[in-house]
A protein has these predicted regions:
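Short, charged/polar low-complexity linear motifs in solvent-exposed/disordered segments
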Residues: 25-26, 51-54, 169-171
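Short charge-dense sequence patches
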Residues: 26-28, 33-36, 58-62, 94-96, ...
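Structured beta-strand-rich core segments of catalytic domains in phosphoester-bond hydrolases
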Residues: 1-48, 150, 155-159
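Short aromatic-enriched loop/helix-cap "lid" or pocket-rim segments at secondary-structure transitions
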Residues: 46-50, 107-109
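Metal-dependent phosphoester-hydrolase catalytic domains
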Residues: 77-78, 82-95, 100-176
Length: 176
């Protein structure tokens, strides 16, 4: 849904995964902006814990947790490489937003961000935690934008629709 005309789009579902991204070219005045909405591989821990408790009646051994984290991290890294290649090949102004399922210290964050600006770091405030559980301090949902934009505002509306908080960035074009 957009108040601006969508002039082109592409939906990509990652193989062997419930994850995907949508790439949309949106006409804003005389400019076309390429927006990526991404949902990357989860850590898999919640599902693993539920299955293990159901099957074995106890919590998951730490070795299994580490293995699951490593496996899903590799999957996320491949997804990021694919998206980054598309970003690098575009000449339009770019916005990347979504559920990265990884922290700001991760390969996922650094590789996908590249030279773009993290909206929260630029104009947000507080901890910026987007995952509702584990104390609410994990930031795993992001909005990145390239240098043709300037951040005006960044906030998280109050809703309880998901285990993740929504993030909103207000941007304006930089006129060079």
């Amino acid at each position: 849904l957009s108040r601006f005309p969508i002039v082109d789009h592409r939906y990509v579902r990652f193989p062997d995964s419930g994850n995907d991204y949508l790439q949309a070219d949106v006409k804003v005045g005389d400019d076309t902006v390429r927006i990526f909405s991404v949902h990357l591989q989860t850590s898999g821990i919640s599902g693993l814990r539920q299955r293990f408790r159901k099957d074995h009646g106890r919590d998951v051994p730490v070795e299994r947790v580490i293995g699951e984290l490593e496996r899903n991290s590799r999957i996320r890294a491949q997804q990021v490489r694919e998206i980054r290649a598309v970003i690098d090949s575009t000449h339009y102004p770019v916005i990347v937003a979504g559920d990265f399922n990884d922290t700001p210290s991760s390969y996922t964050y650094r590789r996908l961000k590249g030279g773009m600006t993290d909206g929260f770091r630029a104009v947000g405030n507080g901890f910026g935690g987007t995952f509702r559980y584990l104390g609410g301090v994990l930031r795993i949902d992001y909005i990145f934008y390239d240098d043709r934009f300037a951040g005006v505002g960044y906030y998280m509306p109050q809703d309880d629709v998901s285990d993740h908080k929504a993030v909103v960035a207000e941007l304006r074009f930089r006129r060079i």
